[in-house]
């Protein structure tokens, strides 16, 4: 009955070929207009999982409550903390009034509150030590504040040397500061530029990358009509940095990360090279079609049929799901692969029949008769396989399955309506020779003669590799699907190395202050947790004691920091005299001693001597290198001595908003102990926190939960697909053995594909796991073609036109998949890589294993 229906459709369409093609073109053009008006790609990896899951609901609630899903984080970095502070302040001031691009701008971990109260967040012992050091340095600070010049700098050095002479300071204790100063002076003399940090000079420990970083959080005004909604805002930040001459004046750079820049660059990465790859793919597919069909007219018909079907499928897909995601966009590649497959199968069968009978209409009807069962069964089986993903919580693949499933039906319908009509109108010339592969006769004979060895050997090899599947890795960290070389991701990966940034933090939400304290206490006891923070963390402990120490320091330092008068800037001659005097003092102090302090003193003396002998411009440049950061440090010190009591009521509104919403929802943040870039560390961290607080959310929780969701989705969908396809096959073939002949090679190919993944170290991830349903679709189609031909009594299948069709169909599919492999997007590239691998194993199973498994056909009567 199915054969009669398909043949009748082909007869009707070829009888009214022009009308059929015209209707198809109208549909395709209308679909194209719909696509152009509604085309949208959602590049947010977080949306690949269903928002109906409990943990995703909490994730979305958190993003909405604390406005975390539409921010830009500007990371300002410079060679020294002082330059970083100056550059960050300049950028903040420059953009503070830009209401065109930004709703709000907030420095993170800096600003007036932290500048004034920063000392209160240190342990009381550290506050006592710092204020004591400041008090001891008061004479030096007074000199530098009163005379910020080379003369003042050398005066401070002279004061230090006097302390050495009096025995208050050991000469070897000055080795580090003397070397730092000498290194800076030498840098200006030798390279024309250098940087200097007073904070580094006075610090007992080396500065870290986080000391040289400042953060500004922007909430941009997004243009959702643009493909990159936040591009104007990110461009405004970069333009401001350029206008401020960040690189020249501060030696600084600004890097942008956060949800908005990541989404912008994700789209750019996906689009990068897409046009070139697309054109290249089309050209290669055209070449393969030529090799398969040897007729410009037939190729034109197949290509026109393909694009009509693709246009309709794209429009229907957008109508069904609203916007494509990073996985569902692969439907186009899938449609090209299987759409061309259906076209090639019909066209090669047509060529074979045209060789037997030179009548066009007879050849088309015979092609329809022989293709009806295999094509319709392949279309139904592949559509059923893809639609099996529809009920899963893995939304990315669920939508891919939905679009691809409908696409298979569109491809099948167009292949029995539009394609025969086009062939009827174009009327390709008759075939001069058979379209099979006679040279494969020895292979056919070998497979038939040694079928038992081949079947048993293949099954044994596949079974022997099954233990490897235990080592199959799942990498469900979505950040690994991003391009690590784009600025937003590279910046995020850098920040993730620093636990102070909280890039891999987990949060717990609550409306109760008492519960927040209990949660904080519970999480702080977990060995996997490095630190726990909440709004209460910004109210320092032991404030009375610390404020008393700061007040004592302020009484001593305020006069030094605020001298009654500042000396007039010295002339260049005065600077030279001061330098020469200090050179002499350094050499006298060092004498003939051999210790590190003496060596450093002589090195500094030599550097200052060279500076005295250089020109005025070099001395002015050197003075600026030391004085510019000095002014920053002195201003910071003045602010630090103005600390006031801090309570929850006195915290800045911007700071409070980040931890507590207007309706009283609070968050408690836990940060991981150990390597934050290690997936196992994050999994253990997430598992421990979830065990203590099951409602926790955040990046590591998403990684853990997403992995579970994806694995469950593929197990459920795989079982459903297998069941539905088996039922369809049985319904059509009516023999369990024939169903097994179709499915066993598919299962063997799937197992071998996964085993090879382990051997070559390729983990499954959010993107490339899509290869499994695609393998199901392509694999089932190829195997159905062979089984239906075998049931019809055909022998020597490798020599037949069917093998030609399958081989070149696989080649076009491989080309489509290969174009994904060349993508600059890591997720898409990994998808293409695994697709190519799965196609190789599938083709091997079809061409080599399945003929041996089937053996000689039964009598057609059976």
Where are these regions (language model features)?
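Membrane-proximal extracytoplasmic
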Residues: 2-280
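Solvent-exposed, non-transmembrane loop/terminal regulatory segments of multi-pass membrane proteins
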Residues: 36-79, 192-206, 444, 448-453, ...
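Short, low-order "capping/linker" segments at domain edges
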Residues: 116-134, 543-559, 709-719
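C-terminal, active-site-flanking charged/polar segments
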Residues: 483-488, 512-568, 575, 841
């Amino acid at each position: 009955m199915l054969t009669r229906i398909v043949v009748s459709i082909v007869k009707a369409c070829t009888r009214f070929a022009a009308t059929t093609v015209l209707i198809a073109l109208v549909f395709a053009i209308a679909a194209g207009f719909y696509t152009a008006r509604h085309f949208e790609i959602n590049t947010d990896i977080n949306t690949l999982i269903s928002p109906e899951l409990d943990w995703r609901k909490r994730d979305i609630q958190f993003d909405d409550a604390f406005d975390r899903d539409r921010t830009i984080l500007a990371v300002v970095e410079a060679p020294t903390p002082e330059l970083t502070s100056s550059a960050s302040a300049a950028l903040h001031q420059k953009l503070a009034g830009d209401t065109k691009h930004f709703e709000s701008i907030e420095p993170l971990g800096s600003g007036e509150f932290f500048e004034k109260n920063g000392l209160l967040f240190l342990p009381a012992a550290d506050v006592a030590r710092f204020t004591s050091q400041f008090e001891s340095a008061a004479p030096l600070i007074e000199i530098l504040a009163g005379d910020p010049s080379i003369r003042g700098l050398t005066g401070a050095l002279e004061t230090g040397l006097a302390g050495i002479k009096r025995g208050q300071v050991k000469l070897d204790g000055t080795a580090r500061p003397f070397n730092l100063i000498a290194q800076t002076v030498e840098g200006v003399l030798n390279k024309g530029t250098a940087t200097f940090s007073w904070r580094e000079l006075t610090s007992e420990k080396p500065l870290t990358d986080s000391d040289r970083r400042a953060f500004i959080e922007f909430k941009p005004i997004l243009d959702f009509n643009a493909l990159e909604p936040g591009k104007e805002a990110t461009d405004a930040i970069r333009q401001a940095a350029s206008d401020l001459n960040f690189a020249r004046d501060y030696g600084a750079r600004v890097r942008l990360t956060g949800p908005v820049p990541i989404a912008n660059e994700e789209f750019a990465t996906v689009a990068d090279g897409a046009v070139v790859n697309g054109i290249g793919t089309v050209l290669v597919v055209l070449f393969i079609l030529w090799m398969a069909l040897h007729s410009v007219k037939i190729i034109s018909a197949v290509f026109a049929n393909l694009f009509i079907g693709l246009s309709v499928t794209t429009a229907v897909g957008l109508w069904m799901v609203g916007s494509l995601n990073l996985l569902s966009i692969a439907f186009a590649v899938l449609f090209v692969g299987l759409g061309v497959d259906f076209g090639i199968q019909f066209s090669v069968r047509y060529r074979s029949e045209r060789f037997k009978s030179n009548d066009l209409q007879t050849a088309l009807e015979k092609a329809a008769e022989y293709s009806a069962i295999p094509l319709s069964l392949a279309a139904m089986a592949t559509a059923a396989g893809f639609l099996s993903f529809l009920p899963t919580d893995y939304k990315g693949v669920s939508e891919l399955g939905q679009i691809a499933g409908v696409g298979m039906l569109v491809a099948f319908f167009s292949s029995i309506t539009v394609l025969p009509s086009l062939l009827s109108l174009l009327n390709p010339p008759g075939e001069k020779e058979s379209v099979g592969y006679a040279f494969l006769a020895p292979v056919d004979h070998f497979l038939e003669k040694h079928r038992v060895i081949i079947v048993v050997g293949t099954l044994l090899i596949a079974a022997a590799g099954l233990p490897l599947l235990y080592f199959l890795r799942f990498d469900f960290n979505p950040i690994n699907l991003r391009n690590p070389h784009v600025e937003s991701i590279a910046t995020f990966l850098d920040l993730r190395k620093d636990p102070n940034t909280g890039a891999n933090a987990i949060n717990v939400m609550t409306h109760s202050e008492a519960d927040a304290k209990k949660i904080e206490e519970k999480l702080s006891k977990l060995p996997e947790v490095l630190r726990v923070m909440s709004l209460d963390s910004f109210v320092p402990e032991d404030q009375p004691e610390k404020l008393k120490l700061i007040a004592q320091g302020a009484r001593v330092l305020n006069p030094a920091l605020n001298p009654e008068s500042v000396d007039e800037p010295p002339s260049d001659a005065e600077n030279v005299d001061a330098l020469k005097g200090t050179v002499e003092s350094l050499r006298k102090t060092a004498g003939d001693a051999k210790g590190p302090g003496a060596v450093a003193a002589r090195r500094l003396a030599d550097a200052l001597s060279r500076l005295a002998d250089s020109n005025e411009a070099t001395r002015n440049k050197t003075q600026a290198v030391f004085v510019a950061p000095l002014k920053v440090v002195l201003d910071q010190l003045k602010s630090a001595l103005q600390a006031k009591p801090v309570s929850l009521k006195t915290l800045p509104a911007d700071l409070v908003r980040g931890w507590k919403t207007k309706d009283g929802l609070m968050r408690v943040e836990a940060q991981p102990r150990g390597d934050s870039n290690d997936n196992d560390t994050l999994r253990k961290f997430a598992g421990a926190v979830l065990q203590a607080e099951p409602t926790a959310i955040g990046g590591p929780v998403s990684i853990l939960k997403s992995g579970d969701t994806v694995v469950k989705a593929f197990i459920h969908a795989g079982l459903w697909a297998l069941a539905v396809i088996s039922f369809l096959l049985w319904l059509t073939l009516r023999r369990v053995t024939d169903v097994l002949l179709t499915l066993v090679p598919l299962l063997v190919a799937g197992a071998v594909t996964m085993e090879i993944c382990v051997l070559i170290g390729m983990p499954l991830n959010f993107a490339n796991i899509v290869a499994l349903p695609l393998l199901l679709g392509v694999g089932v189609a190829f195997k159905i073609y062979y089984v239906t031909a075998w049931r019809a009594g055909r022998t020597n299948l490798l020599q037949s036109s069917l093998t030609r069709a399958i081989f070149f169909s696989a080649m076009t599919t491989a080309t489509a998949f290969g174009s994904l492999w060349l993508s600059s997007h890591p997720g898409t590239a990994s998808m293409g890589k695994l697709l190519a691998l799965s196609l190789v194993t599938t083709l091997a199973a079809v061409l080599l294993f399945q003929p041996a498994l089937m053996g000689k056909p039964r009598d057609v009567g059976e």
